[in-house]
Amino acid sequence: MRLSDITVLSVTFNNNLLTGLMLKSLAKQLGELPECLIIDNGTTLPADERLKDLVTLFDNRNQHVTGNYRQCSKNHCSTIDYALKRLIKTKWCLLVDNDVLFKPTLKKFLADLNDDEFDVCGEIGWDDAPPERLFPYFCLINVDKFKNENLNYFDNDRCIGPGSKEIGACGPNTKRWYKDTGCSFLEDIKDRWQIKLIKMSDVIIHKKSNGYGFTDEKTFLTVNKELYS
């Protein structure tokens, strides 16, 4: 797969440090910074304007472009949908969370991919609550196919409301979990797209998935400093 065919997409939310170091890690592991689209979904802290010198920065603060669904995951998901349909011009989108760091294996992984053999590439599972989803932490999506088939990445009518009691990887789903990013998309493509399954841990370290939670940012960045410095 050629880097020139890929746009890296990430949504930043009130955290310039993680977004900046994610991009720094990407450039270090690839030896260059490919086309990147960073969407600012912040509510209190604007994205660092200096990012405009390196990437395309799209201002969606307070969801003034995509609309506010009053739930963070819904806003995140609708923003990705907007970007896939209207902003990304390359054949492929590499969707990543802004709190990931890339491993040295990334460059060979992308170079070895034959993009004629799949339509989407990622890991399927469920972490916070059912149902299964294509994790948005690292996922390659064929944007041309997505547009040609008039698909959606976000469907507000298929979001889980409060009261679901299924048992998930994190225990009983007693909180107000909603169907998170990548669920309805997987439902729509699982029987018609070629899905290449991978282990994300082969190419990234994700702050949340690797046990650092939402708060232990300093430990995450210190332990994995060699991936971006």
Regions found by a protein language model. Give the residues of each.
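N-proximal low-complexity "stem/linker" segments adjacent to membrane-targeting elements
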Residues: 1-24
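Short, charged/polar "capping" segments at the starts of alpha-helices
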Residues: 17-19, 43-49
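Short, acidic, metal-binding catalytic loop of nucleotide-sugar glycosyltransferases
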Residues: 24-33
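Short beta-strand/loop segment that forms part of the nucleotide-sugar
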Residues: 34-43, 59-60
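Conserved catalytic core of nucleotide-sugar-dependent glycosyltransferases
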Residues: 73, 102-183
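Short beta-strand-to-loop acidic/aromatic patch adjacent to the donor-nucleotide binding site
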Residues: 90-101
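C-terminal catalytic/acceptor-binding lobe
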Residues: 162-229
